[in-house]
Amino acid sequence: MAKILVLYYSMYGHIETMAHAVAEGAKKVDGAEVIIKRVPETMPPEIFAKAGGKTQNAPVATPQELADYDAIIFGTPTRFGNMSGQMRTFLDQTGGLWASGALYGKLGGVFSSTGTGGGQEQTITSTWTTLAHHGMVIVPIGYSAQELFDVSQVRGGTPYGATTIAGGDGSRQPSQEELSIARYQGEYVAGLAVKLNG
C-alpha cells in the first residue's frame, strides 16, 4: 500500500477544491491510501475573517508526519510567483527532515491557483526547489492530460501541474477542465507511487 498525502493551503477555497479533485484521482488507483490535510493558518483569526477567508474542515498536518508518506502532492495559491507564506512557513519547519534525509526518494508534485493567470508555472517550479533540496523525486504531468490542449476557453493547467485561475476578485471557481487535470495529476502520481512502493 502506497501512502499519498495531498497537502494544501487555501484561503478562499480554490485550492481546497483542487485538493479534493487531486485526492479523488489518486483514490482511483488500487493500492493507494490517500489522505488530505492542510497546513496551519498563520494569519490571526480576526484578520482571516475580515479578509473573507473560508473555514476548512481538513485536518492540520505537522511537518514531522511528511516522512510517513510515499508521495506528497502540494497545493498552494500563488503569492507574487511563489508559494503562499503559510506553505512556506510550514516547509521552513522541515529542517529536521532534511537533516535526516527523511523525504529522500519520495515523490512530490505541486498544483496551484492564480488570480489572473500570472505566476502559476513559476509558483510550481519555485516550490520544486524546496522539494529538490529534500531529495524528493519531482513528478510533473507533462502534456498527457488531454485537457491541456483545449484552447477554447480560459483555463489553468500546465505540464508542471494542475492549476486554476481564480480571477482578480476570486469569483471564478475551478472549471470542470481544471478539476479534470487535477484528478489526472492525483491519479498519475498515485500510480507511480504504487509502482514504486506498493
Curated annotation (Swiss-Prot):
Keyword field: Flavoprotein, FMN, NAD, NADP, Nucleotide-binding, Oxidoreductase
EC number assigned by the record: 1.6.5.2
KW Flavoprotein (keyword) present: yes
Cystine crosslinks: none
Domain Flavodoxin-like: 4-189
UniProt xrefs under SUPFAM superfamilies: Flavoproteins
Residues noted as binding substrate in the record, renumbered to the chain: W98
Cellular component aspect of the GO annotation: membrane
Catalytic activity: a quinone + NADH + H(+) = a quinol + NAD(+); a quinone + NADPH + H(+) = a quinol + NADP(+)
Pfam families found in the cross-reference section: FMN_red
Top EC group: oxidoreductase
Cofactor(s) in the UniProt record: FMN
Highest rank taxon of the organism: Bacteria
Residues reported to bind NAD(+): Y12
Manner of cofactor binding, per the entry note: Binds 1 FMN per monomer.
GO function term, MF aspect, one: FMN binding
NCBIfam families, per the entry: flav_wrbA, PRK03767.1
HAMAP family to which the protein is assigned, alphabetical: NQOR
Protein name: NAD(P)H dehydrogenase (quinone)
